[in-house]
């Protein structure tokens, strides 16, 4: 993928080769819609959603009661970040993020640069 640091780019390439999974919390999709509506990113909803429906290597993770319970133990400022981190923690997943607060928190293992 273009414009990503090497480690993040490599993670996406592993997924493309079928060597790994990427979990996508539903809040991330909601954020994408919001940012597109505000004109901050370019996004084709139909293409994104259809690709996610057929891609076995991208797993959409719903907001569940377990995630909400885990949010209580995530001391970050932004609710959406807390949801994302709580989801990663419950899944035991490495979080691909450039968010400095999340990376500095060491709540979950992160990957970016």
Feature locations, PLM:
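Acidic catalytic patch
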Residues: 49-74
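Phosphate/NTP-binding elements of NTP-utilizing enzymes
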Residues: 32
